[in-house]
Amino acid sequence: MEKFKRPFRKSKRSFRRRLPPIGLGDRIDYRNMSLISRFISEQGKILPRRVNRLTLKQQRLITIAIKQARILSLLPFLNNEKQFERAESISRTTGTRTRKK
């Protein structure tokens, strides 16, 4: 009684390569706000390279462009819009306390 061992095979899913976020015709420039705003988080921070899926050179150029736009006040340094409004504060009752002796 011999056991038949089947070789392990990986499932053949179709691998779809993601399109690069910056096309060949896109110029990385501090005035190109539609391009720059794609690489900034909601808080106004520059997104990291692994999130952006950019090359090292592209990430460097994007970072420089964002910093130039911030200095020229085209972009804010921080986005301080409050997302959550404060709920009404609970008023504490001030009454007499009884002590246990």
Curated annotation (Swiss-Prot):
Main location per the UniProt record: plastid
InterPro entries: Ribosomal_bS18, Ribosomal_bS18_CS, Ribosomal_bS18_sf
GO biological process, one term: translation
Subcellular location: Plastid, Chloroplast
Key words of the record: Chloroplast, Plastid, Ribonucleoprotein, Ribosomal protein, RNA-binding, rRNA-binding
Example GO molecular function: structural constituent of ribosome
Gene Ontology cellular component terms for the protein in this record: chloroplast; mitochondrial small ribosomal subunit
Highest taxon, organism lineage: Eukaryota
Complexes and interactors: Part of the 30S ribosomal subunit.
Similarity comment text for this entry: Belongs to the bacterial ribosomal protein bS18 family.
Protein name: Small ribosomal subunit protein bS18c
Species of provenance: Nymphaea alba
